[in-house]
Design a protein with these regions (language model features):
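TerminUS-proximal long segments
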Residues: 249, 331, 529, 547, ...
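Catalytic-domain carbohydrate-binding cleft regions of carbohydrate-active enzymes
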Residues: 108-642, 647-648
Length: 780
C-alpha cells in the first residue's frame, strides 16, 4: 500500500476509564487528556467544530482527498473547564468515555452523546429525539428520511438479493456514498473517515442512533445551522464547493455506443457517429455535449475493463469524426475510459506503467493507474490520455471508479477504495482545464465526500423499467443534500431488459430535462434512446422539453451560480425550505428545481393524473396559470405531454429564445415570467461561460425587483453590475395579475401594445432595452 502515496493513520479507540483530565488551549484547538485517552475539539467557526478522540497523544494526520480546508481564522470562543462556548453553541465535555453534549445559545440541547468507543471499531452513540429525522448519506436510492434505518456507506454496486430483472439492489446502492448526516433539529454530522462506515439511525433502538467505522478513527465534524442550506454550506467549507461547469454543459449531453454496444462491438464505427450528429441537427434536437462510450476503444488482454487509448479499426478517421462534431457546434466531445490501462496494437501502456511502478499492486491485474500519485498521473496524461486529446477530446467519462478492490484488504486499503473515485476524477478534470484553457469538466459514476469538486456524478446503470424511475429521483434528491449538486442519470434508463416503453421514456425525459445535468444515453442496441425511434409524437414531446430546458438556461445558470455561492443544490426536496412541515419528509417524487420551480414527475405507467402536495405559500400551475394555496394535496391531469410544474409565489423566471446549442446566438431577448408576491428580488447571473474568471469576480448580475400592492405592480430592472459586460437585453414580460390593468407604463412612458389574457389572468408587454434601468408600473 506504500506505493499509493496515500497517507492515512488509523488509531484504534478503546473505552476510557475514569481518570483525571487536563486541558490545553492552542489557537482554535482545545485538547483534553487523561491517562486513558485524549479528545481534541477544533473550532472551525462559531457554528462548526471538529472532534477527534484517540487513545494516546498522537492525532491522525490530515488527509487531502475529502477535506481540503483545515485552516480557519481564529474563532471567538471561551473555555471554562469542560465547557466551550461561542456566540452560537455551548459544548459540554464528559469523560469515561470522552463524549460531548451540544446546545444552542439559548441552552436547547441539539446533540448528546451517550457513549463512545469500542475495542475493534470506533463509534458514537447519540440520543435521538422522538420527532427527529435524518437526511443525506450520499446517492441513496432507497428513501429520503433514514430514521429507523441502517445505512452502510462504502463505494460499491448494489448489494443484497439480486432482483428478478436487472442486477442492482436499490437498498444497498452505493455509487456515491457520503458520510454526511443532516438532522431536522438544526445540526449535521460529517464523519471524517474513508473506512466503510455504518449508521444505525434508530434501527436497533428507537431512542438513539450511532455511527461507526470498524478499524477507523473517531473523527467527525459537528455543524450547526437552523436551515439545511447553512449545514451544506459549512460542509462545503471543508470539502470544497461545486464549481461552475462550462455553460454548454447545462445543455443536453448525448452519449453513443457508436452503433455497437456490448456483444456488437464490431459494429461501432466513426461513420455512425458522423451520421448521428447530422441527424440530431437535422431533426432540430438541441444538444451541446457528446461522448462516445466504451466501444470506441480497442479491447485487448483485459477486455472491456482495460483502456488502450486506441480506437477500434472500424474508426477510419477519429480526428475527422471529432472535427465534424465541432464543425456542427458540439461544444465539447468526450470519450469513455476505465482506470485500468492495457496494451494495444501501438501503445504498450500496461507494460510500461508496470515497469515504472505507476500502477497499484492490488493483488489482481495490477493494471490500475495510481491516481493518488502525481508522478503516475503525469505519466498517464502525457502517454495515455494525450493519444486522444491530440485528436480533439475535451473531457472523459471516468467509469468504474469502484475498480480498486484488494485481495485481503486491510483498513488502509479499504479507505483507498473509497477515496479512489475522487483521485480518478480529479486527474482528468484538472488536466483538461489546463489543456482547454477553461473550466475543467469530467463525467464520473462513483464518488465520496468531496467529489463535488470534479464536478458531477451520474446515477449509474439502472434499467429501463418503472421500478427504477422513482428511486432515481430519490438518488438525485439525496446526493444534493450530501453536497453534490451536479448529478444526472440516463433518461429512459440505461439497460433495456423489457419491451420498449414510450410512456416510460417520455416521463423519464421530462424529469431528466429538469435535472441538474441532462443526459440522453442507453445501451438498447440498436436504438440507443434516439427520440425518433419512439415515433413522431414522442419526438415532438422530446423536443418540447429539450427546447424548454434551453429556454430556461438563464434560470438554470443563475441557479448554478446560486449553488456556487450558497451551496443550495439545483435539485432539492420540498422540506429543504419547509423543515417544519413533516408532510414533506416522505415525498420523493416532487422536488424544487432552483428556488422557484416545483417539478412533479409522473412515475406511474399510463397515469391519467397524479396528486401533488403543496407546501406553505401560494403556487401557480406553469401550464394553465391556475393558482393553488399551500398546505394541501391536489390532483392534476397528466396527459403524456404534461409533467406538472409549478411556480412559487414571488418567482421571477428569466427565459431566452430556444436554441439548437448554447452559443447559437447571443441571448439578447430575455422573457421574464413572473408570479408576483408583495416583494421579491431576483438576480440574473451572467459570465463568459467558459473561463475561471468568475472566481476572480468577473461576472455580471442584473437585479430585478417586483412589488405588488393593492392598486399597482412595479417591476424594476437595473443595469447589469460587475466586471463582465453582457450583451444588451431586450425584455418582454409575462406577469400573472388577478385584475386587468388600467394602464401600463415603462420608464415613464405609456405602453399601448400590452395584452391581458382573462382566462390565464396573465399580462404580457414589452419592457424594451435593458441597457438602462427599466421601471415598469402597472396600475390595477
Amino acid at each position: 500500500m506504500k506505493n499509493l502515496k496515500l497517507k492515512l493513520t488509523f488509531l484504534s479507540l478503546c473505552a476510557f476509564a475514569t481518570a483525571a483530565h487536563a486541558q490545553q488551549v492552542k489557537g482554535n484547538s482545545v485538547l483534553y487528556t487523561s491517562s486513558q485517552g485524549n479528545m481534541r475539539i477544533e473550532m472551525c467557526s462559531e457554528s462548526m467544530f471538529r472532534v477527534t478522540k484517540v487513545p494516546a497523544q498522537q492525532m491522525p494526520d490530515n488527509e487531502k482527498w475529502m477535506v481540503v480546508n483545515y485552516n480557519f481564522p481564529q474563532v471567538n470562543f471561551s473555555v471554562d473547564g469542560k465547557q466551550i462556548k461561542t456566540s452560537k453553541l455551548q459544548v459540554s465535555i464528559q469523560e469515561a468515555p470522552w463524549r460531548i453534549q451540544v446546545a444552542d445559545a439559548s441552552g436547547k440541547v441539539l446533540y448528546e452523546e451517550l457513549t463512545s468507543g469500542c475495542k475493534d471499531s470506533i463509534y458514537n452513540e447519540v440520543k435521538m429525539n422522538p420527532d427527529e429525522h435524518f437526511f443525506g448519506f450520499g446517492e441513496r436510492m432507497d428513501r429520503i428520511d433514514q430514521r429507523g434505518q441502517r445505512v452502510h456507506l462504502n463505494v460499491e454496486l448494489g448489494r443484497g438479493s439480486k432482483p428478478a430483472v436487472g442486477g442492482k439492489d436499490i437498498l444497498r446502492a452505493n455509487y456515491c456514498p457520503v458520510p454526511l448526516m443532516l438532522s431536522n433539529k438544526g445540526y449535521a454530522v460529517f464523519f471524517h473517515t474513508a473506512v466503510p462506515n455504518d449508521w444505525d439511525m434508530g434501527w436497533t433502538n428507537n431512542d438513539k442512533y450511532s455511527f461507526s467505522a470498524p478499524g477507523g478513527d473517531n473523527d467527525y465534524y459537528f455543524i450547526y445551522g437552523e436551515q439545511l442550506e447553512a449545514l451544506i454550506h459549512s460542509y462545503q467549507q471543508l470539502t470544497g464547493v461545486a464549481p461552475l461547469m462550462p455553460r454548454a454543459a447545462y445543455g443536453l449531453h448525448i452519449g453513443s455506443y457508436s452503433g455497437g454496444t456490448w456483444h456488437h462491438e464490431s459494429k461501432a464505427n466513426d461513420t455512425y457517429v458522423v451520421n448521428l450528429i447530422d441527424r440530431l441537427r437535422q431533426e432540430k434536437i438541441p444538444f451541446d455535449m457528446m461522448w462516445l462510450d466504451s466501444t470506441w476503444r480497442l479491447f485487448a488482454k483485459l477486455g472491456n475493463g482495460g483502456c488502450t487509448f486506441e480506437f477500434q479499426d472500424q474508426f477510419k478517421d477519429p480526428k475527422g469524426m471529432i472535427d465534424h462534431a465541432y464543425k456542427n457546434h458540439v461544444a465539447m466531445f468526450g470519450l469513455h475510459i476505465r482506470s485500468l490501462v492495457d496494451n494495444g496494437k501501438r501503445n504498450n501502456l500496461l507494460t510500461t506503467a508496470q515497469k515504472k511502478g505507476l500502477t497499484i499492486q492490488d493483488g489482481g491485474t495490477n493494471a490500475i493507474i495510481n491516481f493518488f500519485d502525481d508522478k503516475a498521473v503525469d505519466w498517464w496524461w502525457k502517454n495515455a490520455a494525450k493519444k486522444v486529446t491530440d485528436l480533439g477530446a475535451k473531457f472523459f467519462k471516468t467509469d468504474v471508479g469502484s475498480a480498486l478492490n484488494y485481495n485481503n484488504p486491510n483498513i488502509e486499503q479499504k479507505a483507498a477504495h473509497n477515496l479512489f473515485p475522487i483521485a480518478y476524477a480529479k486527474a482528468p478534470y484538472e488536466n483538461f482545464a489546463k489543456l482547454n484553457g477553461q473550466r475543467g469538466f469530467d463525467h464520473t459514476r462513483e464518488g465520496y465526500a468531496g467529489i463535488q469538486r470534479y464536478p458531477f456524478i451520474w446515477a449509474g446503470d439502472w434499467g429501463s423499467e418503472w421500478q427504477w424511475f422513482e428511486p432515481i429521483i430519490r438518488g438525485g434528491i439525496n446526493i444534493g443534500l450530501s453536497g453534490v449538486g451536479y448529478w444526472s442519470h440516463c433518461m429512459g434508463g440505461f439497460e433495456q431488459y423489457s419491451a420498449y416503453d414510450t410512456d416510460l421514456y417520455l416521463r423519464w425525459v421530462q424529469m431528466g430535462m429538469f435535472s441538474p445535468v441532462s443526459i440522453l444515453f442507453g445501451m438498447d442496441h440498436p436504438r440507443y434512446h434516439a427520440p425518433w425511434t419512439y415515433g413522431e409524437e414522442a419526438q415532438k414531446i422530446f423536443i418540447q422539453y429539450d427546447s424548454l430546458r434551453y429556454a430556461l438556461l438563464p434560470y438554470i445558470y443563475t441557479s448554478a451560480w446560486d449553488m456556487y455561492k450558497t451551496s443550495r443544490p439545483l435539485m432539492t426536496p420540498l422540506f429543504y425550505d419547509h423543515l417544519q412541515d413533516v408532510n414533506t419528509y416522505q415525498i420523493s417524487d416532487q422536488y424544487m428545481f432552483g428556488r422557484d420551480m416545483m417539478v412533479c414527475p409522473v412515475t406511474v405507467k399510463n397515469a391519467l393524473s397524479r396528486p401533488v402536495y403543496f407546501p406553505g405559500g401560494d403556487w401557480l400551475d406553469f401550464w394553465t396559470g391556475e393558482r393553488i394555496s399551500g398546505r394541501q394535496y391536489k390532483s392534476f391531469l397528466t396527459p403524456i405531454e404534461i409533467m406538472p410544474i409549478f411556480l412559487r409565489r414571488g418567482a421571477i423566471i428569466p427565459r431566452q429564445e430556444a436554441m439548437q446549442y448554447v452559443d447559437e446566438r447571443p441571448n439578447t431577448n430575455i422573457s421574464l415570467l413572473i408570479y408576483p408576491s408583495e416583494h421579491s428580488v431576483y438576480e440574473m447571473y451572467e459570465d463568459d461561460g467558459k473561463s475561471l474568471d468568475y472566481q476572480k469576480g468577473v461576472y455580471a448580475v442584473t437585479k430585478m425587483e417586483s412589488r405588488l400592492a393593492q392598486n399597482e405592480w412595479i417591476l424594476n430592472i437595473t443595469t447589469p453590475k460587475g466586471d463582465y459586460k453582457p450583451v444588451s437585453h431586450y425584455y418582454s414580460v409575462s406577469v400573472y395579475l388577478d385584475k386587468k390593468p388600467k394602464l401600463v407604463t415603462v420608464a415613464g412612458k405609456f405602453v399601448d401594445g400590452w395584452k391581458y389574457d382573462e382566462k390565464l389572468r396573465l399580462l404580457t408587454f414589452d419592457a424594451g432595452e435593458g441597457d438602462m434601468e427599466v421601471l415598469s408600473l402597472i396600475h390595477i
